Amino acid sequence: MTIAIDFVGTNVGSGTKTYNINFCNELESIDLKEDFIIYLSKNYFNQIKFLENKNSRIKYIVKSNIFSNIFFRLFWMQFILPFELKIMGVKKLYSPMNFCPILAKLFNIKIILALHSNLPWVFFHLMPGNIIRNLLTRKLMEFSISACKILIVDSYFAKEEISNILKIKKDKIKVVYLGIDKKFLSSECVKNFVETFNYSEKYIISVLSCVRYHNILNLLKAFKVLINEINFNIKLVLILQILDKKYYKVLNSYIVSNFEKDEVTII
């Protein structure tokens, strides 16, 4: 049986991009028993670490970087991809990024969908973007969940939560924990060290994107309570990817007003 995977995604630095590229690299390195067709953006394809002998079980279909744009990507996914899968005789599709081609269900293609966040149902007001776009996003995610045969979430808490919210049978939902980027476990990780940072100091580290739904402001408030209540020399280090500049200004303002110099460091 041929299995298709849709890795056509954003080129913005993110957990999604890291997940997709690492997934491809892992597939390339193992002895596969099934044939795979992998759809991916050109910018992803250029970052795959092919072995000397490319995995013969994998066929790559490289799409234009224009599909890094969410609107073009969704149009292609919903109205073109299902017919491509049908023509190639694909019977199983893995969609790893919250959405899947809904029409594929009409062609008896088994869809496995990965849902990375319950945010649209739990904290809708914290979603980035305007309300109309966010409502459409949530509805399309609901249609995708309805169309899939298996839904993958990243924790048992998320499974209980989404099952209760959308009234999904729990035997449809599987839990697969997200993994760590392998580069941080290898001897090559020294290349990622920040030379100006003192690693011998005591510190708490948090790595995340700077967006409101990560609620970094509450993290800062909690850290302030911690250092005020205990006499302990420790710092907070935030490694941020700044996706929301206005929120970043709010965080900086809070840090300046509430902490001594170097108590909180942003990298």
Each predicted region: which residue ranges?
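Carbohydrate transferase catalytic cores enriched for Leloir-type hexosyltransferases
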Residues: M1-I267
